[in-house]
Amino acid sequence: MEPVIGKLNDVIWIVDLNRQSLDRVIPGVRANDWKNMFYANGWNVIDAKYGTQLETAFSSNNGDLLKTWIDEMPNQRYQYLLRLDQNNLRSEVPQGFKHSKELSNFLNDYSDTQLYKMFRNLGGHDFDKLRDAFNQSVKSSSPSVIFAYTFKGWNLPTLGLPRNHSTLLNPEQMEKLSQKLNIPKEDIWAKLPESSAAGKHCLQKGKIFSKTTKLNSKHIDQINIPTELSRPLPKFDISTQDYLQMILTEILRSNPELAERIVTTSPDVATSTSLAGWIANKNGLLWDDQEENNINNNMDLNQFHNEYDDPLQWTSSPKGKHIELGISENNLFMLLGQLGLSFERHNEILFPIGTIYDCFIRRGLDALFYGAYSNSQFIFVGTPSGITLSGEGGAHQSILSSSIGIELPGISMYEPCFAKELEWILLDSLNKIKLRTGST
């Protein structure tokens, strides 16, 4: 739960909550624990547990019995009832319930077909309930999470099967499903009729998402990225790690158009991965909370840094160019993946640079994979690397990074030995991001 997310009002997460794992029916679902976690972090929590049919039944006289029965029912029992047809469901309903007689009397007002449909009416499959949930989330001033309760295999003959994760429909079942969905047998890939409301909507959205975004020359022409820096190399021995900081500060000094669009991020290791100079040179942290910014920027904190000869003062503002994350490499690569698609999403070029201890790249591998898969354009620097951390033991050794860089498609991997080499690599990578022609 990164603190910065709690300040966003245009974030909607959907938790697809059903009673099955991949292998079995889950004995207990800790939904309330998950909801409380979001509550504690200031999120707007929306429950889409029951559909409108069930909620209408709950609100009628003695409808609370139906709700109590469903809420208290073990998952295994619930899954069993899902497999019953509408002719056999009613006789099984009251069993094991302390108010079975009263519940049976209540359900007598519903036909077998009505009871069958109502029992399956969960919020995650009820469009009216979902529309209401989305409307609530749009009006919220904080990020929202929707818990949508669903069935695995909805509207399929495999609904409720304990092992339906790897189950495929047979040809006969596929044919019945096609008939149910009015899909013509001679054209199984037929689109929705373009004259229908749904067809028009899909056509409009398809044009938006399939169009090729053109480079905005107004922004691009102003950014000149040289092949090397005009500043000479230092006359003393210097590590590539330290020279990274010099490259960034030189770009800040000599190329303000480029520096304006560079955004850096790190999972709580900015100082030890050589971003201190970049942050301290008037860039600061990106933070859009004026009250907290006033606290961060007060004189007492600055005096503390001065007293301990700390060049890095963590000033923050809505114009900051560094995003400081918690210790989560997965969050780092998720953020870089989104920043690296800023042009494709918003027609604005950004140059994202993330720094990370090289040995911990593997911790965020899944998010890195999807960033590269999405053709996101960003730079990440594994530093310190190699045997630099030998004193910290085997768990801090970069034994997989080279393999990841070589084997993962969509990634260009470099291992610079010299400071000048690092300069060439970094500038060339920035230019590829500008032209959208390179890899991650």
State the predicted function of each range.
Residues 14, 147, 266:
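Generic enzyme active-site microenvironment
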Residues 17-235:
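Long, well-ordered, tryptophan-enriched scaffold segments
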Residues 103-124, 128-132, 139, 193-440:
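Thiamine diphosphate
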Residues 1-6, 22, 29-32, 330-339, ...:
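Short, acidic loop-beta-alpha module within alpha/beta folds
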